[in-house]
Amino acid sequence: MIEVLLVTICFTVFPYQGSPIILESGNVNDYEVVYPQKVPALPKGGVQNPQPETKYEDTMQYEFHVNGEPVVLHLERNKGLFSEDYTETHYAPDGREITTSPPVQDHCYYHGYIQNEADSSAAISACDGLKGHFKHRGETYFIEPLKLSNSESHAIYKDEHVEKEDEIPKICGVTQTTSESDETIEKISQLTNTPEQDRYLQVKKYIELYVVVDNRMYRNYNSNRDAINERVYEMVNTLNVMYRPLNFFIALIGLEIWSNQDEINIEPEVAVTLRSFGEWRNTTLLPRKRNDNAQLLTGIDFNGATVGLAYVGTLCRPTQSVAVIQDHSKRTSMVASTMAHELGHNLGINHDSASCNCNAGPCIMSATISNQPLSEFSSCSVQEHQRYLLRVRPQCILNKPLRKDIVTPPVCGNYFVERGEECDCGSPQDCQSACCNATTCKLQHEAQCDSGECCEQCKFKKAGAECRAAKDDCDLPESCTGQSAKCPTDSFQRNGHPCQNNQGYCYNGKCLIMTNQCIALKGPGVNVSPDECFTLKQNDPECGFCRIENGTKIPCAEKDKMCGKLLCQEGNATCICFPTTDDPDYGMVEPGTKCGDGKVCINRQCVDVQTAY
């Protein structure tokens, strides 16, 4: 049974309007002073079970007033904030690398919401008082302790009451984005996904994030590693809240501080720094620490108003699943917003066009980074992101960490099967399972299972019972083994298997057809160009190359002309190609695509399908 500790906080509220006060987040002109007082309580019908001794509760509630109105803030510890193999790395004065695995299980970073408000969220650090933000009635409020001696006072304020550190608008360094026209966005919104595509989009996705802090930023915080750690934890906790609407969960797998010297050349020219960091990730970081994405936080002032840069549509790639972000604000929420923006580029999202908007406040993917933090994704961003996922299907985001890999003490009754548990159907009052003992989280006598595609009436289904049907020509059906409640791992047809009436060949579980690639890039009503276009554009410097080497575009050989730039036909425009971007694969024919009878594209060459794999 889950132990829930509800902590009621009585806040005495003193609206304050006078001279500004200096908080960690900057100068605040208007705020309310509150004094939290903890009152332990149990939920209605709750039973308190012995639990491992921890400093911070898994679940807490705070009651207080906002503008004279009582609210209840519900908080739950962000159990997915750290991965089990989370490490911290710094460097000794002699350059030695020092890597540790600190005990981060009992951390103090929470997500939450205001009770009885559907559109509410919160990200709070409870390490030393309450610090963070919550959304109430469409507006974002910040809370942080007032550093007064012998006082538990906190300040609650809104973003508009914080003095701006710099009036110059900040920008992202990504310039070669392909913003869609209003007409194209409207057409995309009318597309209907297949049931299989909808299932794929609804599956929870995970990014194991590695954060690097450069030497300048380290020195900016008085060479205090603890202060750096706390700042990064808050940022990643906030990043998680911003990505939940996209069904993404971000786990911090490593934090590295270049405490002795920078391990790469960090230049004011942001593109140079991004390239160097990507090469470092590929050659130095990945061989010693797995991760899905790495971000560099730097204390350098990039040229102009730029505060970040990332490659577009490159998640999971060794050299390009990276971003660089200037630590441009005292406020962690501001820098977290920039981290979210650059990660959005890695996830295939370009800058919003003028027709894109958000329900409240600025959009995360606006080309100009707002002075207001804690933005949200526009409908344009959501559509573009989904198109990227369906077109590329990056594999690293699907490897869900095992429950034992999520750092948290097991809690019986929270519906998650954690280490040492055989099942978890909630509290005894809520449990609806005949197979699971809600008090012990163990299976009932003679029960083999509680849930799963291959579990039926507490028993494993017989071997051979189909548990996952083939979704298309390139998929294979899966059957139960008779020994497990889980359906076996999804498998697919061999590469080169003909699909969709011989229009294409299977490649890594997908039937790759050029017309479908055109639709993914341009929307409905588009087809692949006729063969004559590929001949006509063969020597075109923008549309006729097969690869780029040291910045030089290499034309396709005659036999390989169907494996370079993708050409599409829309209306009277018959030979459309796509502009070159920071993503070298954008607008190129995908590997495994049919380029002739019995031929497929591999490494930008049109080769015999019988020998390609």
Curated annotation (Swiss-Prot):
Subcellular location: Secreted
Entry GO MF terms: metal ion binding; metalloendopeptidase activity; toxin activity
Pfam family, one: Reprolysin
CDD domains tied to this protein: ZnMc_adamalysin_II_like
Tissue: Expressed by the venom gland.
GO cellular component, one term: extracellular region
Entry's Gene Ontology BP terms: proteolysis
PROSITE patterns according to UniProt: ADAM_MEPRO (PS50215), DISINTEGRIN_1 (PS00427), DISINTEGRIN_2 (PS50214), ZINC_PROTEASE (PS00142)
Domain Peptidase M12B, residue spans: 205-401
Glycosylation: residue positions: 282, 437, 550, 572
Annotated binding of Zn(2+), by residue: 341, 345, 351
Motif (D/ECD-tripeptide): 473-475
SMART domains hit by this protein: ACR, DISIN
Propeptide: 21-191
List of residues binding Ca(2+) 2: 414, 416, 418, 421, 424
Disulphides: 316-396, 356-380, 358-363, 412-441, 423-436, 425-431, 435-458, 449-455, 454-480, 467-487, 474-506, 499-511, 518-568, 533-575, 543-577, 546-556, 563-601, 595-606
Cofactor info, note text: Binds 1 zinc ion per subunit.
Binding annotation for Ca(2+) 1: 208, 292, 396, 399
PANTHER family: ADAM A DISINTEGRIN AND METALLOPROTEASE DOMAIN, DISINTEGRIN AND METALLOPROTEINASE DOMAIN-CONTAINING PROTEIN 28
Annotated family: Belongs to the venom metalloproteinase (M12B) family. P-III subfamily.
Its job: Snake venom zinc metalloproteinase that may impair hemostasis in the prey.
Name of the protein described by the UniProt record: Zinc metalloproteinase-disintegrin-like MTP8
Source species of the chain: Drysdalia coronoides (White-lipped snake)
Lineage of the species this protein comes from: Eukaryota, Metazoa, Chordata, Craniata, Vertebrata
